[in-house]
Amino acid sequence: MNRIRQCLILTMVMVIGLSARLAAADDAAQKLYDRVTPSLVVVQYVWQNELGRNELAGAGIVVSDDGLIATSLGLFSTQIPDEQMKDFKILIPRANGEPDELKATFEGRDERTNLAFLKAAEPRKDKKAWTPLKFEDVPAAIGDKVTSIGMLPKLVAYKTYYMESIVAATLRGDVPQVLVGEGLAAASSPVFNADGKAIGMVAVSQAQALLINKPEALVSIQAPPKLYVPASDFLLSFSDPPKAGHPLKLPWLGIPEMTGVAKAVADDLGLGDQPAIQVGDVIEDTPAAKAGLKQGDIIVKVNGQPLERGDQAQDLPGIFRRRMLRFKPGEKVTLSVLRDKGQPLTDIAVVLGEQPPQSDTAARFWADDMGFGVRDMVLIDNYVRKLEKDQKGVIVTVLRKSSAAESAGLHQEDLITQLNGQPVTDEGEFAKDYKAFRDQKPHEAVVLVVQRDGQETTVRIEPPQ
């Protein structure tokens, strides 16, 4: 009888202890939820392109006390020209009623970390101070508990919600990621360790909805994401964020094609387990070419440090590119390369240039009457199309469905080299000559000579009747 009584007492003690721990855990979760919720907002803007208007919105995190908001670069794709993004807003959810709307400025994209930034352009309507969230570089071990707090879609009033999981694995592709077992809150949500420190951000995945103002955002609740990016990968953005009117100047090497060296090849070259990448091509007159880097060179070290290992050889070029993005234009970087099997490494000092203009910043023109748009060529166009570096023309960017241009057989990505028998130099000249011709001869066809897949063809666009 005494033994039974002792067992009952022991069981009661264990139950009481477990209940206390569960209560403490519940209390900690509620405190974290209450602390983090004011740091979560909605960022919203209008993408006004040639074909119409689309309102985009996603989750944002307050990262400074002056209203600087971080969000995923995926929401502000580099394929969207800056001039087409308008009406930026920050929405602050309220427990009851519609969210407060604040005008905002777009500070810019940060391709180094895959983040974008906005800042409030007017005071908060509720008169409250901003509550920035501080991220810390704290690694998580297998089996560690992690939590995330995200924002539900517009359909459920942007309410915040809490998720718990366990670290299952660490992955190293182009971007370092941590895999969890159960699931996390929606893309761009902050991730916390057991001490309540913000240690990462939920990764954006092709399978997960990024736009929280669309019905498909519910997918993130029904099938929660399981990957997050550790803070070590993006803290740079918070200490050196882009600023409105002053986009970040990114470094430029001029090596568009690289291949990760497979283990068997590395062994044959005597590199053993050392990660390496092989240069596939070097663009003429770029920093890499001027420094003497050659096709076939095998890069083994950067500034004396071995390349970072990826889970697969194919991950190495992406890892290398992201590492190079951490430097600044004008900095000197020493690349140690292997040129001949069994020979010592050759050190090549490269003074990094500034990344040339990209397609999203190229000047554009929209021929509304014929239903097509064009932009200036950029350096990468010449490289991808294997054109001479002095090739002139404009690139077709968009076609309106059932337009005169589409009906005539014009294709997106066509390179227009002639307009009505005259050479096309750039967007400015094309726009001027096109508008002049349409004003003077509105009933005559527009005749374009285009290059497509290495072949030249003529497209005759009859004016709409």
Language-model segment annotations:
Residues 64-113, 122-123, 204-209, 215-217, ...:
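Catalytic-histidine neighborhood of serine endopeptidases
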Residues 81-85, 301-334, 419-447:
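PDZ domains, with a preference for the canonical peptide-binding region formed by the helix
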Residues 23-72, 112-116, 141, 146, ...:
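N-terminal activation segment of mature serine protease catalytic domains
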Residues 36-53, 121-132, 158-224, 272-280, ...:
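Active-site region of chymotrypsin-like
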Residues 28, 32, 78-81, 129-178, ...:
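Flexible, gly/ser-rich surface segments that form the specificity/activation loops bordering the active-site cleft
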